[in-house]
Amino acid sequence: MKETYVIGIDYGTDSVRALLADAATSETIADSVFSYPRWGRQEYCSPAEARFRQHPQDYLDGLRHVIGEVVAARPDAAPHIRAVSVDTTASTPCLVDRTCTPLALRPEYADDPDAMFVLWKDHTAQRESEEITALCARGEINYARRSGNHYSSECFWSKVLHLLRGSERLRRDAWAVVELCDWIPAVLTGCRAMEDLRSGLCAAGSKVMWAEEWGGYPPEEFFAGLDPVLLPILRRLPVRTYGCDTPAGTLSPEWAAKLGLSEQVVIGVGNVDCHSGAVGAGICHGTVVLNLGTSACYMAVMPPEKMGDRMVEGIFGQVDGSILPGMVGFEAGMSAFGDVYAWFKRLLCWPLREVLLPADPENETLRALAAQ
């Protein structure tokens, strides 16, 4: 049997990770981690305002770094790498221009947080979230029914509305909005137009209100009743969505040269990170998979014939095919999990850093503890 390798890439909250694996045996051949430098310095973030933004350049630098490292670890495997697939946090959208380029990659927007990717845990759009939830509840069709009758400030339309309301300049220059899990495959395949972009079912269904039962996204009348500023964005979203088992295309000549890989490498449609974690853990009907990290995402699946027309109140995402084809995927959990532990550690260590260490600065034990 010919050697066949694949690369999986996971964009998390603090870092991007890559794994080179043997497609036949699932053996891990090499891995790599790249921490986002701007994020590490908390640039463009304001915890007091619940504002958390990430610069697209961190994502691009990380992409080259992690793939470069896993390929360098086994250069003999490079000619046999057949596919690369990506999952990311969500909803992590960004305003883009006509070429699908994030506005923050243009010089005039390089330091504008609103032109960057709005990280999943950004809660600046709470007011917009409440408006959308209220509008859904009043409508003949409740377009929030698949997110537990509540549309979160962590979701796509809340964030987009907040950004566009806040800046006339952004309203002028933003041609469209792209989720991170759709943008990375677009970058790798050389996609430069929204009409050519393959939108992932997972993010569209769980974060962007896409559902087959109402023919895709909610109609223009819904968004006009919310705020007409959203209508141009709605009209430019790809109508069709694709599962992560579908190719988005092949590696572009530009990125093949950058990464030292073949232009024949298949790039998968992007996915949401916790949904990929559920698949990797072997999720099936009757099991629950817990993805524990910065947040805690609890995942389950159910055959649609057992669901019928019912929806579960309070469950964040209930989407056909979002985790496994032919199954309804469920996503619930806690937005703050690892973040709470990190806060608690900082709280406990405060006396070490602020009281004990200044009193005994040469104490190696105190210095080590305070540095953690």
Label each PLM-derived region with a short phrase.
Residues Q54-Q57, I81-T88, Y109-A110, V118-K121, ...:
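Active-site nucleophile and cofactor-binding loops and adjacent substrate-binding regions
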Residues R17-L19, T189-A193, A211, E362-Q372:
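Conserved ATP-utilizing enzyme core subdomain
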Residues Y11-T13, A134-N271:
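Gly/Ser/Thr-rich active-site cleft segment
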Residues C155, M209-P325, L352-R353, A359-E364, ...:
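ATP-dependent carbohydrate kinase catalytic cores
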Residues S46-A50, D111-V118, Q318-E331:
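Short beta-alpha connecting loops at secondary-structure transitions
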Residues I29, P75-C155:
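Active-site phosphate-binding/coordination module
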Residues G326, A332-W343, L348-C349:
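A conserved active-site cap/scaffold subdomain adjacent to cofactor or substrate pockets
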Residues M1-L105, P232, A257-V269:
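N-terminal glycine/serine-rich phosphate-binding loop of ATP-dependent small-molecule kinases
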